[in-house]
């Protein structure tokens, strides 16, 4: 039985590779993330394929531009039918408010459910040293909280952040704010290139709403068994 708190990242570049993953996981996974690599290579057929197979879609394109451009982009992605869409928090409150309004208006016109908009806080590839090297003045955790509060005030539904900041965001933004966490690594998996990581159970205990996991599942020798072990760990934490 799939647990919709688990989102599997389709970090591949072809439809064939995507279809292979979705087929291999079958009914064990109900939610997938389509990012830049796959969407830029194969376009909206990626989303349509997942929808046709009864899957939810997290479209992680990290929109970041002037408010009008982002608003038009969100309108297009709303028509496409994505369930979750990401917006860069560094674009500021005017941009985020424009995105929220565009999603609401487009969904109303089409008579469909509005996608949830998630603000990107600080990418999980950053550690303190690399963050400082690009001019980050606040500590990472403080910047994440600042952007999360700004996102909520601007009409965003939640954030994407490291699980290490999830507890602070949950306390700052309340029980209904979505917290989606990449950088999740079960005990049997390597950490790869992400610095701020956590296990599935610790992330959920600290307030994460949904977990994004890619390589520990998609590159596993037995992907469905990897999913089973992860869901088993997740279910030890009450929804």
Q: PLM features: what roles do these ranges have?
A:
Residues 15-17, 38-53, 66-72, 89-116, ...:
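Active-site-adjacent beta->alpha loops and helix N-cap segments on the catalytic face
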Residues 3, 69-73, 78-157, 165, ...:
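Conserved anion-binding
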Residues 4-10, 32-34, 57-61, 85-87, ...:
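Hydrophobic faces of well-ordered beta-strands that scaffold small-molecule active sites
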Residues 9-13, 35-39, 64-66, 90, ...:
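Active-site beta-loop-alpha junctions enriched in small/polar residues
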Residues 1-24, 28, 104:
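N-terminal glycine-rich anion-binding loop in soluble enzyme alpha/beta folds
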Residues 80-94, 186, 193-226:
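Glycine-rich phosphate-binding active-site loops on the catalytic face of alpha/beta enzymes
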Residues 13-25, 68-76, 138-150, 195-202:
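Short, acidic/polar
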Residues 27, 53, 80, 154, ...:
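Structural motif
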């Amino acid at each position: 039985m799939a647990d919709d708190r688990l989102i599997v990242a389709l970090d591949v570049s072809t439809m064939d590779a995507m279809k292979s993953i979705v087929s291999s996981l079958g009914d064990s996974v109900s939610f997938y993330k389509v990012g830049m690599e796959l969407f830029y290579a194969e376009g909206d057929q990626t989303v349509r394929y997942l929808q046709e197979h009864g899957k939810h879609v997290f479209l992680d394109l990290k929109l970041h531009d002037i408010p009008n451009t982002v608003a038009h982009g969100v309108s297009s992605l709303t028509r496409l039918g994505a369930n979750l869409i990401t917006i860069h928090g560094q674009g500021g409150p005017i941009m985020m408010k424009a995105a929220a309004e565009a999603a609401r208006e487009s969904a109303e016109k089409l008579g469909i459910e509005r996608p949830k908009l998630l603000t990107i806080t600080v990418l999980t590839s950053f550690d303190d040293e690399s963050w400082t090297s690009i001019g980050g003045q606040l500590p990472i955790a403080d910047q994440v909280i600042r952007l999360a509060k700004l996102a909520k005030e601007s009409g965003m539904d939640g954030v994407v952040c490291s699980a290490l900041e999830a507890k602070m965001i949950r306390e700052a933004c309340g029980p209904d704010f979505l917290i989606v966490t990449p950088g999740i690594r079960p005990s049997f998996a390597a950490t790869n290139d992400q610095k701020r990581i956590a296990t599935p159970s610790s992330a959920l205990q600290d307030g994460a709403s949904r977990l994004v996991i890619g390589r520990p599942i998609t590159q596993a020798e037995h992907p469905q068994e990897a999913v089973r072990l992860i869901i088993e760990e997740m279910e030890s934490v009450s929804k």
